[in-house]
Amino acid sequence: MTPQVIQNLIPEIYQKELEDTLFKLPFYYSSSIGYDEKSIKSYGTKFLDNIGFSHSLIMDGNVDSNYWFLFKPILYFLSQEIKLPVVNVIRARLRLTFQHPERKNFIFNKPHVDLPNYDNYKTLILYLNDSDGETFIFDKYYNKFEASGSVLKDIDKKIIFKQTP
């Protein structure tokens, strides 16, 4: 499936409110910006395993933040746009990624699978502010132990929505 890009998913005034709120929330350090620090390692590609900070809104289907109410309306705009209901939210998080001083020596940040223990889900990526780089979407990953590098799992189950700041 080709990622779907939706420009201006949320109204500008709502986007501004979310941006203003971001830096009032508690963010927590992570030594790896992938799904978790134990995610599958990538081999043969020059990638950056960058640090970051995140704030969990929903984890394993449960509300994990007192601020979820502020971000939940994004799903209403999404449902209206794609003309499908959002039935379940497995995980929602806010992420702050920093420019690594050696970023020009790398092609992209560490590849990862958003929810490696789940099947048949969609991913929403919403940028609330300007990003200095591209988002790379991969449709498969490889196991380092496979000599041929054949595909282990197809992860092309995502729809990507980009909010133009």
Identify the residue ranges that each predicted region occupies.
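Non-heme Fe(II)/2-oxoglutarate
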Residues: 1-86
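Catalytic core of non-heme Fe(II) oxygenases with the double-stranded beta-helix
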Residues: 65-165
